[in-house]
Regions:
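Intrinsically disordered, low-complexity N-terminal segments that are enriched in acidic
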Residues: 1-79
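Secondary-structure boundary elements
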Residues: 13, 70, 76, 80, ...
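Short intrinsically disordered coil segments
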Residues: 24-26, 85-92, 209-213, 235-236
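Residue-level signal for pocket-adjacent positions within structured domains
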Residues: 45, 56, 90, 146, ...
């Protein structure tokens, strides 16, 4: 399997800014070709890369005012490494978080999934339920909406589906987290978000939107929710995102069998 991914961001920096982007593929991959560039009014800007314990790669940029253009590309041959079951992740992924209010949704999870033990059957049931209960409506949710708002509104985008799946799984005692990915086959193409749950001693991915085959996903960032996996975080100053373009292609697009357990590789 060969995959190519790219990301192009154009930002207007109206106040000197300190910002972090997470658009590079995670440390689970070893790209045979990869490049990250940042230009402020055409001049190169140095980026400082750091990683977290889950393999997410962040690039930090400190820039003055002007037009900032960020480009990333990577070519990946074969599969990436399997994500390990780090003890801290298995602990933190059981707890409520900013956008995954599993404690609030515990009664809902108990009522909807009563009698289904934690495992593959519960994972399939939650993903199917979320996929049928929600409508995919771009612009229907805001950046501060969590799983509760999504359930009440019954609509959202990929991150909302991922948050609600994670919340219901955590409420039933399953470690669940959110992953930002490149998703070959996704239309319209953009950064995508999915849910991972610890099932049968491995992180298994579900995508309640069913918009792209799970077998071809490329991991970017992993965390409790979108607060950990956002592609752009402005620490100080002000920037406006003017343009975002994402591509993700694979030499052979998989046919996804939703009854099968799949891991992001």
């Amino acid at each position: 399997m060969q995959r190519d991914v790219t990301a192009h961001l154009e930002l207007s920096v109206t106040e000197p800014a300190d910002l972090v982007v997470a658009i590079a593929v995670s440390t689970h991959y070893q790209p045979s070709d990869e490049a990250f560039t940042a230009l402020l009014d055409g001049a190169p800007v140095a980026a400082t890369e750091f990683t977290d314990h889950s393999g997410t790669r962040f690039q930090r940029l400190q820039v003055g005012t002007g037009s900032l253009v960020i480009d990333y590309r990577a070519h990946i041959d074969g599969e990436g490494a399997q994500a390990p079951g780090v003890p801290y992740d298995l602990f933190s992924s059981r707890l409520p978080s900013r956008y995954v209010e599993s404690d609030v949704l515990s009664p809902t999870a108990a009522a909807e999934f009563a009698g289904i033990e934690p495992g593959a059957d519960l994972l399939a049931a939650v993903s199917s339920w979320v996929g049928t209960q929600l409508s995919y409506v771009p612009g229907a949710s805001g950046p501060t909406d969590g799983a509760v708002e999504t359930l009440l509104g019954r609509q959202g985008v990929c991150r909302d589906y991922a948050h609600l799946c994670a919340a219901l799984l955590r409420a039933r005692g399953v470690a669940a987290r959110v992953a930002a990915v490149y998703a070959p086959g996704l239309a319209p193409m953009e950064f995508h978000a999915v849910t991972e749950a610890w099932i049968d001693d491995a992180w298994r991915v579900v995508d309640a939107t069913a918009l792209a085959p799970r077998q071809n996903l490329v991991r970017i960032a992993t965390g409790r929710d979108a607060a950990d996996t956002a592609f752009l975080t402005v620490l100080s100053g002000r920037t406006d995102l003017d343009v975002i373009e994402v591509t993700a292609v694979v030499d052979e697009l998989a046919r996804d069998d939703v009854t099968q357990l799949v891991s992001i590789r």
